[in-house]
């Protein structure tokens, strides 16, 4: 199960609203683009989304989550946060400003020594968030 699925499960169990948040820096360095050209609106290597209109980001990021929420009778609010802060800071700020009770965040599976460490975004959110944080591998 991924973080979104856990979030949906918890929202269903506790009859809570689910906020699906997409946070990304507003400007992403062109070195991460498939063709190294920021004007082409290509997606970021690794499946991310960059420099797309807000409605396209929402559609690409939230379509599966919205469908799963509908199937499970879970109220979902979708938000896109594109600022010049770090992704972790944007998540933390959003949670504080919107009285979020629990943050469910995913982290990439690691092996060996790296398994002992969280990703930088998840680690910062766990460290600085005002509310409990559930990290899903």
Task: List the model feature ranges, each with a label.
Residues 23, 79-81, 136:
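Conserved beta-strand termini and adjacent loop/short-helix elements that scaffold enzyme active sites
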Residues 94-137:
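Gly/Ser-rich helix-loop-strand patches that form or flank binding pockets
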């Amino acid at each position: 199960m991924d973080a979104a699925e856990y979030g949906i499960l918890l929202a269903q169990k506790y009859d809570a609203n689910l906020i699906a948040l997409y946070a990304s820096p507003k400007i992403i360095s062109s070195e991460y683009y498939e063709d190294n050209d920021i004007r082409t609106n290509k997606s970021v290597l690794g499946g991310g989304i960059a420099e797309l209109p807000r409605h396209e980001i929402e559609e690409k990021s939230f379509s599966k989550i919205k469908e799963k929420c509908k199937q499970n009778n879970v109220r979902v609010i979708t938000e896109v946060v594109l600022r010049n802060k770090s992704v972790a800071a944007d998540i933390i700020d959003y949670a504080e400003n919107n009285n979020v009770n629990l943050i469910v965040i995913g982290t990439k599976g690691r092996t060996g020594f790296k398994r002992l460490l969280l990703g930088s975004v998840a680690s910062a959110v766990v460290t600085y968030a005002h509310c409990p944080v559930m990290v899903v591998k």
